[in-house]
A protein has these predicted regions:
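Anionic coordination/interaction segments
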Residues: 1-182
């Protein structure tokens, strides 16, 4: 299934839309106003089902336990071990929660999405929690994010039919001064 997450922003906030599917880490596109103001490229549901694991949010874990290193990407849905790996998705009016419990590795991963209410900017907030569910010590390194953020007002036409030209014109402002692109 697929749907739009409510863009709840409060009385003084700016609403943000987010499109999710029941695969991967859920969110496959989000932005403000409409799809011409996407932050993450909009795809219809039939395409989103197959690209969310590549173009959506991803989490990579490097887990060290008992002198053994395991590299793992949760929420991939490529395991036939449904007895030891459980995934759930909770959809609330103000929050989307994904949870994976992997008994083989001994971890529980929780991802929460929610909008930023009553603020002068729109925001899709994301929280990732990794919990050790064993009695053994583990060390975890995490890399998390999305593979591509669209420049402001890169409309749907430009995304679909002029992407190479638009990429050549995209710039990053203020990086030299602050070290933070915006």
């Amino acid at each position: 299934f697929s749907s739009f997450f409510p863009g709840i922003a409060g009385l003084k906030g700016i609403p943000m839309w987010a499109f999710y599917v029941n695969r991967g880490q859920g969110i496959c596109s989000f932005g403000i106003k409409n799809k011409n103001y996407s932050i993450m490229e909009f795809y219809p549901a039939n395409v989103s089902y197959s690209v969310v694991n590549t173009f959506g949010f991803r989490t990579f874990l490097k887990i060290k336990k008992s002198n053994k290193t395991i590299c793992y990407e949760p929420f991939l849905n490529n395991s036939a071990d449904t007895e030891n790996i459980k995934q759930t998705m909770k959809i609330l009016p103000y929050e989307l929660i994904l949870e994976e419990i992997n008994k083989n590795i001994g971890i529980k991963i929780t991802v929460k999405y929610f909008t930023l209410p009553n603020q002068p900017v729109a925001g899709l907030m994301r929280s990732v929690t990794v919990e050790n569910i064993t009695n053994s010590d583990i060390s975890v390194e995490v890399a998390d994010g999305i593979p591509k953020i669209l420049p402001y007002y890169m409309n749907t036409y430009a995304q679909k039919f002029m992407s190479t030209t638009i990429q050549a014109w995209a710039t990053v402002d203020n990086f030299e001064k602050t070290g933070v692109p915006f």
